[in-house]
């Protein structure tokens, strides 16, 4: 699996992946992403800012992820304690094609994100998710992330994790 920076012409495929992910979350009883977020405007901003990436596997688009090296303002309001106070990378909006779910691709996305972060001398990796998203919580724990506390984001409480890399 490799990451490729998303371009405006990828928007249609990305929105397909986002819609698939929304349906997957709903089927699994997860309230996350059921209020219109992320929408096309959000993804267009990811692309414009160079933080939107396609996950390419066997020459096909297998997923989308936002990898952001800018500070997340909501993380300043953590009710808890981060592992570090150093610069960090954040993953948002991870959406995988239904055909590749359960095959370890999300873990590969995390590995590639870590590689990108280390290439920029960044050694902290943060992620947040809804408390009812058991799938993402399991993925984070499996990949060495530690629970650090809760944040308020988009008028809802999220659980926040960090991994030192």
Map each language-model feature to its residues.
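Conserved acyl-donor/pantetheine-binding loop and adjacent beta-alpha core of acyl/acetyltransferases
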Residues: 66-93, 101
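Conserved catalytic-core motifs of GNAT/GCN5-like acyltransferases
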Residues: 69, 128, 141-160
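Conserved acetyl-CoA-binding loop-helix of GNAT-fold acetyltransferases
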Residues: 96, 102-115, 138-142
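Conserved beta-strand-loop-alpha-helix junction that forms the acyl-donor binding cleft
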Residues: 101, 127-136
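Conserved beta-hairpin
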Residues: 51-65
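A short beta-loop-alpha structural element at the N-terminal edge
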Residues: 2-16
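Conserved GNAT acetyl-CoA-binding A-motif
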Residues: 110, 117-129
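Conserved GNAT-fold acetyl-CoA-binding loop/helix
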Residues: 22-42
């Amino acid at each position: 699996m490799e990451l490729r920076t998303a371009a405006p012409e990828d928007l249609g495929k990305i929105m397909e992946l986002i819609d698939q992910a929304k349906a997957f979350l709903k089927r699994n009883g997860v309230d996350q992403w059921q209020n219109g977020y992320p929408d096309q405007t959000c993804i267009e901003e990811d692309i414009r800012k160079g933080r939107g990436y396609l996950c390419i596997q066997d020459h096909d688009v297998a997923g989308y992820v936002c990898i952001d090296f800018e500070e997340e303002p909501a993380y300043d309001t953590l009710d808890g304690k981060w592992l570090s106070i150093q610069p960090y990378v954040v993953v948002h909006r991870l959406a995988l094609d239904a055909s590749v779910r359960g095959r370890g691709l999300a873990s590969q996305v995390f590995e590639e994100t870590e590689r990108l972060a280390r290439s920029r001398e960044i050694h902290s990796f943060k992620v947040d998710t809804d408390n009812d998203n058991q799938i993402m919580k399991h993925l984070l724990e499996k990949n060495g992330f530690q629970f650090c506390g809760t944040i308020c984001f988009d008028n809802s409480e999220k659980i926040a994790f960090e991994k030192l890399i």
